Amino acid sequence: MQPLAMHRATMRETFARTRRTTTSMGTSGKATGRRATRAVRVRAESGGESAPTSEDAATSGTPVRKTSMLVIGATGTLGRQVVRRALDEGYDVRCLVRPRQNPADFLRDWGATTVSADLTKPETLPPAFVGVHTVIDASTARPEEDSYAIDWEAKCATIQTAAAMGISRYVFYSIDQCDKHREVPLMNMKYAVEEYLKVSGMDYTVLRLCGFMQPLIAGYAVPVLEEQPLWGTDDDTRTAYLDTQDVAKMTLAAVRRDEAANKIMTLAGPKSYSVREVIALCEKLGGAEAKVSNVPVGLLKFTRAFTRFFQWSSAASDRLAFAEVLASGIKFEADMTETYKTLGMSEDEVTTLEQYLEEYFSKILKKLKEVGGESRQRDFYL
């Protein structure tokens, strides 16, 4: 069996097994979570005393505050924006971070608290969930990590822990149209996690994302300014990009509003763009001409098929499968009318791509002018 096929078969088997488990969890509802919580005795980080769980707090007359929040993946591009926004709105934010020699001090500097845990070691998770009302899961595998271990197995463990600890709301970030492209391992895992959440017994909110504006700086804006070659595609795929700060704003709106509970919503920017249009916008704002090398979609398909034959390249094949979808001419966009109503927001509150890139180029060009054009553009990001 080829590596990718083996990967999918294993995932289907695991999903079937875990779905059977969570079906029983879902039918018994919150009562099952309470029973599981009583079985999970969490040792406090100081003094060795048994720490009360979220359910224990509620039954003892000290209900968990609605403003208590755990952010998973808090050091990532999106996670840190969620932390910052939540703190600004008065939430008591706890961040789950990986054990490391140099912890994320900036999170504590902002006013959040941190707790160390390893997503791949479920036994380390429960202490992070004590006294928490809402979990926002912004974690995802890094390029060097095993996506299956982080984006599927760890997600199952995290959701099981949250349900057992009596978490009231679980917010999960998914990918737009993941249900339509399950041939792509990452999108298949995102869809499977969505289904897993539905039977967890918790209130949930799934936010499907189209694309972030932030990567466009390194991918297109900087190469245009530095007159470096960049890669494009000859397809008509369009993406409605969002600033991660706006995603954070929408996330907190979803947490506040009961109307967003137990819903799957797609978050999209005001307008969708093709790669060619993004490059043209960077050229216009940067006052330079881009050196573009287009990659034919056919080459992506061939490369993906070729890499399947090698065990060491299965991860590369997975990424190429995702790239193939991105270059297939589909539209990652959504009508946000009903979503804005649900969130109590309006389109005027969302940054457009033109505004975002214009702010970047105005700052970088001003800085370059001040230093005589000798600095490297890549040192300056919004």
Where in the sequence are the language-model features?
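N-terminal chloroplast transit peptides
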Residues: M1-R34, A44
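A hydrophobic C-terminal alpha-helical subdomain
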Residues: G47, G298-L382
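Oxidoreductase cofactor-interface core, primarily capturing Rossmann-like NAD(P)-dependent enzymes
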Residues: G47-D109, T120-V132, R142-Y148, T161-R169, ...
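Cofactor-binding loops of NAD(P)H-dependent oxidoreductases
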Residues: A117
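Hydrophobic beta-strand segment of the Class I
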Residues: V135
